[in-house]
């Protein structure tokens, strides 16, 4: 009987923990546009960033955590694998020609690229440009890599 009572008392905590882990795993960063395989004859094109369960906030502004899985930050666009956030999990994402920062909290941008093939990936950075993790540094908030081509 004591075991049954203990199980009944603990079950809300187990359900709450499962729900929290589910919410944490639903954090997502992705490209609304362009889509993987995009081809264009125009050098300039619009890139739209998508996010799920993320508060997009400007760089330099520390947002207080309001719950365990609260995730906030701003977008970084990495072109042609110019930087690997997975290899530099605790380092600020640097600035560079192919590492674009959207520290104002922007969710879209117009890019101009010369003809060629490109890979694009989004990474979420915190107020100090460090990569943001879902729960711990085992899983960073990054998008899938997409491939595009700007035609001559």
Please report, for each region that a protein language model flagged, where it lies by residue:
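Short amphipathic, basic-aromatic surface patches that mediate peripheral association
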Residues: 50-67
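Generic short beta-strand segments
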Residues: 49-55, 123-128
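Extended, well-structured beta-strand/loop surface patches
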Residues: 65-115, 121-150
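Sec-dependent N-terminal signal peptides
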Residues: 3-12
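Short, compositionally biased P/S/T/A/G/V-rich stretches that sit at domain boundaries
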Residues: 19-45, 50-54, 152
